[in-house]
């Protein structure tokens, strides 16, 4: 038993004080003595040896607060002494360096012949490479930060109520801005006097059809004989598009009706309800002198999109142009 324990100490017998070896029965065979005669004495001697060796082993592992490296016994089991793999494969591992736990009490190291103390079955922190220790610290810090993020501060009932009220205010403001935008869009689309206000979907459909209609009017080239000059205004004023164009294209004018009507009975629109919207018109003074000239114009006819039997906007745009003979 004593020979196996001394294999763990590089200094061998020099490590122990000389007073320990002065006892007569240190190297004697204890099995030759009769345990019935001196059983109490044998038990006391064995306990004293275990305590002394545990104290010496602990002092050797942590001398002056520094962890000293111990080489494992050759007869130790590989699975008991194999340290867990730490660090990258390219870094050297000190697989044979072990030390005792600093917090282990004296005499707390169980021992059996043929196996090292249990404190030697764990690798010492001092033998790890600097890169491995740094990665371990970084991993611990990252785990602590993640745990702190997962822990959410418990809000009080007053704070929750305040957050709900702020969210409701933001939602009301958002809906109010959307409603204001649709009201502005409805004011620019020529519509019939509906009994109820158009929904958002119907307003968007009318706006799409009306925008396509105006785009076709602006981009269409209607050849007219001669260079026309133009323009007739309306009650609400007019806006010119493109100015005088070369060739036979006449000047196009978009008239913005603001719903004002002349009170004069001679007005052809006298008595009709005001219709806000736009119209496109042009005039050619040279063609006014000629007879039997057919002039065409595409007319925008707003319809109620809520009617099931109403025409689609594609059909409205594809209607044949309005014709009249001057």
Swiss-Prot record:
Task: Note the SUPFAM superfamilies from the entry.
Answer: HLH, helix-loop-helix DNA-binding domain
Q: What does this protein do?
A: Transcription factor implicated in the cell fate determination in various organs. Binds to the E-box consensus sequence 5'-CANNTG-3'. Plays a role in early and late pancreas development and differentiation. Important for determining whether cells allocated to the pancreatic buds continue towards pancreatic organogenesis or revert back to duodenal fates. May be involved in the maintenance of exocrine pancreas-specific gene expression including ELA1 and amylase. Required for the formation of pancreatic acinar and ductal cells. Plays an important role in cerebellar development.
Q: Can you say what this protein is called?
A: Pancreas transcription factor 1 subunit alpha
PANTHER family in alphabetical order: BASIC HELIX-LOOP-HELIX TRANSCRIPTION FACTOR, TWIST, PANCREAS TRANSCRIPTION FACTOR 1 SUBUNIT ALPHA
Pfam families listed in its UniProt record: HLH
- Whether Transferase counts among this entry's keywords is no
Tell where it localizes: Nucleus; Cytoplasm
Summed up, the tissue specificity of this protein is:
Exocrine pancreas-specific. Expressed in azaserine-induced pancreatic tumors (at protein level). Expressed in AR42J cells but not in ARIP, DSL6A, or DSL6B cells. Down-regulation is associated with the change of an azaserine-induced acinar cell carcinoma to a ductal phenotype.
Q: Where is the composition biased (Gly residues)?
A: 229-240
Going by the entry's taxonomy, the superkingdom of the source organism is recorded as: Eukaryota
The encoding gene is Ptf1a
Under SMART domains, the record lists: HLH
Q: What does the entry give for GO biological process?
A: amacrine cell differentiation; cell fate commitment; cerebellum development; developmental process; exocrine pancreas development; generation of neurons; hindbrain development; neuron differentiation
Region (Disordered), start-end ranges: 229-249, 304-326
């Amino acid at each position: 038993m004593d020979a196996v324990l001394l294999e763990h100490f590089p200094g061998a017998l020099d490590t122990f004080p000389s007073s320990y070896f002065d006892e007569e029965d240190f190297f004697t065979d204890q099995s030759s003595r009769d345990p019935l005669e001196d059983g109490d004495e044998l038990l006391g001697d064995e306990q004293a040896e275990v305590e002394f060796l545990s104290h010496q082993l602990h002092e050797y592992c942590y001398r002056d607060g520094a962890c000293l490296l111990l080489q494992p016994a050759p007869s130790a089991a590989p699975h008991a002494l194999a340290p867990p793999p730490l660090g990258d494969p390219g870094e050297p591992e000190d697989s044979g360096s072990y030390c005792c736990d600093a917090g282990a009490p004296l005499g707390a190291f169980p021992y059996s012949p043929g196996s090292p103390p249990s404190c030697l079955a764990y690798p010492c922190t001092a033998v790890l490479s600097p890169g491995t220790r740094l990665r371990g610290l970084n991993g611990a810090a990252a785990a602590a930060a993640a745990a702190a993020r997962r822990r959410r501060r418990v809000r009080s009932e007053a704070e929750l109520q305040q957050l709900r009220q702020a969210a409701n205010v933001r939602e009301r403001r958002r809906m109010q801005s959307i409603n204001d935008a649709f009201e502005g869009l409805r004011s620019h689309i020529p519509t019939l006097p509906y009994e109820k206000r158009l929904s958002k979907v119907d307003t968007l459909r009318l706006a799409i059809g009306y925008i396509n209609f105006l785009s076709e009017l602006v981009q269409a080239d209607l050849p007219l004989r001669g260079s026309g000059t133009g323009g007739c205004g309306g009650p609400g004023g007019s806006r010119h598009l493109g100015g005088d164009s070369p060739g036979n294209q006449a000047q196009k004018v978009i008239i913005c009706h603001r719903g004002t009507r002349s009170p004069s009975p001679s007005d052809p629109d006298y008595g009709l309800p005001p219709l806000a919207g736009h119209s496109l018109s042009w005039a050619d003074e040279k063609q006014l002198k000629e007879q039997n000239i057919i002039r065409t114009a595409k007319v925008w006819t707003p319809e109620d999109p809520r009617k099931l039997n109403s025409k689609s906007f594609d059909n409205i745009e594809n209607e044949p142009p309005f014709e009249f003979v001057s």
